[in-house]
Amino acid sequence: MKLSIEGIKDKKEWEKAGIKLPSYDVEKVATATKEAPVWVHFGIGNIFRIFIGGIADSLLEQGLSDKGITCVETFDYDVVDKIYTPFDNLVMAVTLKEDGSTDKKVLGSLTEAVKAQSAVEEDWSRLKTIFASPQLQMVSFTITEKGYALHDAKGEFFPFIKSDIDNGPDKASSAMACLLYTSDA
């Protein structure tokens, strides 16, 4: 068993292991989302993957949506390279229940992972395309003060914010600058 689009096609192995698979067509959802993104999320760590990703998965399972989430990482770009890309953006959600048993489920609602890194032209261009999409409806966040803080205790801009101001939109690095400069595409 491999957590990948190809791997989840062998449904019997996953069922035998007690792992629930999406009932929706993950590839179709990913394609539809890439063509017309409706939901972008900044900060794609553990809390996001299971809780917010779980909400999107539930909407897909109930037929209330036909699109997933475009995932954007602003801080730890290895998350995209090591957690999303190798597994085709699929996530294994494991919930520990009060009786000690677990529910295991593959989430297919996280359809694309993008680095909010202006130095990576392909990703930066993709973000601009996403934010120019007339179908985009929602932007959500699970970021800490590292992502939204602008000033230090003295009221001065943090060095990374000052750098964003000095260098302009083509070299944005902070979450807020990435949001500002890509949404102004």
Show where each model-derived region lies.
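Well-ordered mid-protein domain cores that form the structural environment of catalytic cofactors
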Residues: 74-180
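Intrinsically disordered, low-structural-confidence terminal and linker regions
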Residues: 3-6
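Conserved small/polar residues in nucleotide/adenosyl-binding loops
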Residues: 181-185
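An N-terminal structural lobe/cap that precedes and organizes the functional/catalytic core
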Residues: 9-119
